[in-house]
Amino acid sequence: MRPGEESQLVPKEIENAADEPRVLCIVQDTTNCKSVNERITLNLPASTSVKQLYEDVSNKAGYVSSTFSLMWGNGASNTDMAALDPTPDRTLQEAGFEAGKKNFLHLTDKDGEQPQLTSDESGTADSSGLDDSSQEKFIGPLPREESVAGTSNYVSQNYSYSSLLSKSDTGYVGLVNQAMTCYLNSLLQTLFMTPEFRNALYKWEFEESEEDPVSSIPYQLQRLFVLLQTSKKRAIETTDVTRSFGWDSSEAWQQHDVQELCRVMFDALEQKWKQTEQADLINQLYQGKLKDYVKCLECGYESWRIDTFLDIPLVIRPYGSNTAFGSMEEALHAFIQPETLDGPNQYFCERCKRKCDARKGLKFLHFPYLLTLQLKRFDFDYTSMHRIKLNDRMTFPDELDMSPFIDMEDEKSPQTDSCTDSGAENEGSCHSDQMSNDFSTDDAVDEGICLETNSNIEKLNKSVAEKNSLYELFSVMVHSGSAAGGHYYACIKSFADGQWYSFNDQHVSRITQEDIKKTYGGATGNRGYYSSAFASSTNAYMLMYRLKNPARNAQFLEASEFPEHIKLLVQKEQEQEEQEKRQREIERNTCKLKLFCMHPVKQIMMESKLEVHKDKTMKEAVEIANKLMDLEGVIPLDCCRLVKYDEFHDYLERSYEDEEDRTMGYLLGGVKSSYMFDLLLETKRPDQVFQSYKPGEVMVKVYVVDLKTETVASPVSVRAYLSQTIIEFKQLISKSVDLPPDSMRVILERCYNDLRLLNVANKTLKAEGFFRSNKVFVESSDSLDHQLVFTDSHLWKLLDRHANTIKLYVSLPEHPRPTARSVGPKGGGDMNPQEDYCSRAKSVDAILEESTEKLKSLSLQQHQDGGNGDSSKSTEGSDFENIDSPLNEVDSSGSADNRELENRILPADPENNFQPEERSDSDVNNDRSTSSVDSDILSSSHSSDTLCNADGTPIPLANGLDSHSITSSRRSKANDGKKETWDTAEEDSGTDSEYDESGKSRGEAQYMYFKAEPHAGEGCLAEGSKCLLVNVDKRITLAAFKQQLESFVGVPSSQFKVFRVYASNQEFESVRLNETLSSFSDDNKITIRLGRALKKGEYRVKIFQLLVNEPEPCKFVLDAVFSKGMTVRQSKEELLPLLREQCGLDLSIDRFRLRKKTWKNPGTVFLDSHVYENESISSCWEVLLEALDETEKMKSMSQLSLFTKRWRPSELKLDPFKEVVLESNSVEELRDKICEISAIPLENLEFAKGRGTFPCDISVLEIHQDLDWNPKVSTLNAWPLYISDDGAVIFYRDKTEEVMELTDEQRNELVKKESSRLQKTGHRVTYSPRKEKALKIYLDGPTNKDSAQD
């Protein structure tokens, strides 16, 4: 062929390929086999066969082609889709696929089975075909978003920490990290990969009759190891193992040390294996022996003992050195390097009978079969006082020869030479860090060395295998992080194939020798000694070696070699795993959605969760729903059906007529994690016919309004189309409610209080703003009301009232009592309380009885005048009837005519408008008692610590810092002559006044709806209590609401208070009288308590008694009312009788003072001439009352009152408080005053300011050193004293007085006593950082955890 001809062939081929039509296939995966349903797009030639389409989809989706089906509907709707058959040899074009258009297909389950992933077909071995070099390697903590290469992407919904369910391609199974259990996972994987330990564990047989399997540690380890060896899962939970440790869920959030866990777990296993074949297993595998000796350098006498160890702790960096050991061998040599005891550390030689220089050290006598080495990377930095991690580089060999570290002379020499204890543990030591605590029993255990002293030490058995000291590295437990926290994982070499693997919680991957070298630690560049204080790094922390001895080295037991009890356990676990798999399969094919039903008898909407298999038919689903709603025997099954429902809009979307035999998966659009709709189990009477609901319809709730009776009937549901006109809609409504459409007025409520009259006949519902669910009011009367403008009509006012009326449950007080005196300014502004009011008023019982009778007899009355804004709310066709107030008859000017409670509240004087209040109810009550009462009724909120008797349930008082506390110096203000004034008339008032200065009642000139009737049962706060059911317009003010309640409470509105009750039965007082009830909602509960309401300028004040030398220095006494402009002396005069009557405190007016209370601290002393207007006060005002032993010393604002207390070190006790009054803020004057009251010479006096809140309690064991004694200042308002106001605490002492010396027993007793005292008072000022929780394994199970811990 010529070149020219050849060049023409390629364009010809391209041209033919372009001419062939192509089919665009979009495949949606609906199987729920993966966490995210994929969408696959394929653009194939039309000549592609259907079979090839299956293959292409299989490759794209990762499924085996024969395990799924493709649904296709030839371009029709989803409801007509059918399975695409791959067997006939047809092309896509022949099958009906259209070229140039989108062809949508659904990938679905085949025969009810989930598609099989291609990774599942190949098993758990290497199916990728990649060698180790091409595999993605991983070492270190895994990022959350990443996964290990070569693993399956099959999602497990059962294991929250396992992103994949199938086993890793390595063939090994990971462990799920519960929260912070990575240290546990690392050790468990290491033990599992130790053939000798795993095989021995398998040989142990659990006896269920002797022990509970839940608390058996060996059995749970055995189960875990069996699952790790046989399970096909990617990761296994460890919760059963930790539960056998006696741990609860909180233990999973505790970080611990892997070496500590190893020791504790081995101890627990030894305890559990007592009197079994495995009793000595830990010692046989992990225990070594060493000699601890001291040798006299003068006579050669040697004293020694034999110790056992389970692991060898090696320091990274010697104490006091800047250079770390470069290798593990160097650290081992340093471990056995002896130190010389000389100078003050000389050793007392038993032979020489005197102190001599000696050599002290350790010698290894026997190494264990499995050698454990701990690299002590955690240290304490005494400069920064922080725990640090040493990230220095330390190498370790793959094969370790331990023969240089064995003392061969000791092996050859007899062991009977001088076996006495050297007693060196009581001697001083200057050895390096790893030796500093070797002779302390507790510390030695922490280091992994178990001390064992025996006078008759057995001779060491030496075998040929033990002479061989060559060890092979097989596990590196790595810590990544800092001393503050981090992550553990393990690098383990498999003895089966010699390959290294990274076991990082649930992730297992292959690694190489180079990855092991990365765990040596170290960093590039120069690093200072303390540079690693908070550094995060990854390095080896614990190493495990196994002795290379072919005679002893074991191989893992294969499944065929398992003991019989293990085979049974494997079978049991496999059956359980299969059951879990079947259950997961069922879960994946179960449709779960909300189910609602209006109970046909109870007439309440019930809610449940419907779970139905996707292959169940609609008829079967109705049966399930019928049982779920407990309707069996209540209503026949043929009177029930399921319809598509939108609960949020209360909208029936569609019904499923003639589809009873369709599957639920088909009708619901497949199995989904969540649905955008719900189901409603609709019921009917046998004589009724179900209405058909079509998509596109809208639901309308029609309320019929009767203007004559002013009632709103219950709703009737009507379904309409958005395309209907208003005239058609009226005709549709007319058929349902039997009203003439010609005179019908239709009002649409589009949202709250948005009423729209639909009067354009040809306008469509869509144009009027109809949506899925709508609310419509209709009225058809012959009155002239429809001729008025809609907003002026009676219908609009009735609907407006209907929308704003709420139902409240009001609990009344038991017995109205005459109100106590008010504490007010002398000479003016007092309100006339009408003392004979209560005596003339009827009792609550009589009022309720009379009101009930009148409710039965009164006829409905209408108010048609222009100012009539009256409204009522009716439910189920009933109306709120108007009742008159019996108390009003008494109070009226002789009139006996019935008067409605729907009253026009008389307008107040124009100047008596309500003042704005900046604090809401929640703000007011956040820092005040939840149950504030009148001065003669004690607050129940202080019943736990009050000095007086009080009734009611205690409610905790939330104390907080006064937002108006004085932060600047009162003294400087007094000296500068400045005066504090009120910013605005009502700015700091705790409440709006219900009365003006002249005592006139303040009201609102608006007509509001109010109706009250006696109520018993649901809604009442206490059984047997008097309760009202009140229907009220929520636009009424609190003041008007209280006035309407006067007749029922039996006292004027100024003599009771309103408390709102929340879900937790916590009460908050509503005090803002000019606010409406708009924040209230239906069925809210209200409690009425007796107590005088505040007038303008008045403030409710909580009085506390200051008892400086009592354990509880601040006790609540009573509530009082102070007013602006009152002097302190006037308030004291008013308080005296109250204190005498209510609390039994008989005080003289000159023998007590009032002072400011700032949280728990006593503050400024109020002088008798002080006017409260000069003090910044708030609605949550608190004042301290302090009884005096003598007449008042404070005469001027320039004086300063301090509390002083003497510390006696020789007796370890504190004297009572004594008050010192200073004329200035001079330190010299303070020292002189203290000398006067203490008789301490001035040159020996030392003082310090107390810390914390009053009374500044501190332990007697700490006060002598912890306080800042004798500060070098000349004035009290300078640093570090900062004393500028009354109430500061000063401790003082005689510096020549010596501190009492205590024995250990006395000190321990005093520590307990002081700790108990300070805990009771709550005054603990010393700071103690949170201690690390000790790692413990509770052998008696979780029930005895507390006792075991103790």
Swiss-Prot record:
Region of interest (Disordered), ranges: 111-138, 409-437, 815-836, 859-1000
EC number from the UniProt entry: 3.4.19.12
Residue ranges, compositional bias (Low complexity): 929-945
USP domain sequence ranges: 173-548
Active-site positions on this chain: 182, 487
Summary of the function given for this chain in its UniProt record: Ubiquitin-specific protease that specifically deubiquitinates monoubiquitinated DNA polymerase beta (polb), stabilizing polb thereby playing a role in base-excision repair (BER).
Database matches in PANTHER family: UBIQUITIN CARBOXYL-TERMINAL HYDROLASE, UBIQUITIN CARBOXYL-TERMINAL HYDROLASE 47
Protein name from the UniProt record: Ubiquitin carboxyl-terminal hydrolase 47
